[in-house]
Amino acid sequence: NSVTGTIVHTPPTHTQIEQMIEELCAFANDESTENFIHPIIKATIIHFMLAYIQPFVDGNGRTARSLFYWYLLKKGYWLTEYLSISRIIYKSKSSYEKAFIYAESDMNDISYFIHYNLNAMQKSYDQLKQWLQRQALKRQAAQTYTAIDGVNDRQGYILRLFADQPT
């Protein structure tokens, strides 16, 4: 814990890491349909496992989130590219850590972490939707000015800003 300085997770020993990484890679690249796991759940498991294994001295969280994004993009979840789940995790670091600790302390019941991650994704999707709605409103407001011959979208937006703040 970065606030209290207490150790909240002890990763596997260095002798276990290589095998665990090999198993994680096999899991991430397994394309069989025999035991279907929804891609969002599987991406979350990959995220959790790399963070659990902690194979690097630094950057395990960033790498785990990168693998999460990679897997979803690989599976066709293109909107993931525009999500900022890292921002959500940063804003709720305590909840992220609790989900991880609960999963580890409750006989490795990863459902805590999956639940947290699904909520983080929902918040991120909601933020993206709100941003897109704001951009659409800006564009719509600028269209009044883009109707003027020779004025492009960006110029129309700037003219609208001036019109909204006349001083």
Task: Please give the residue ranges for each predicted region.
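FIC/Doc superfamily catalytic core
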Residues: N1-T167
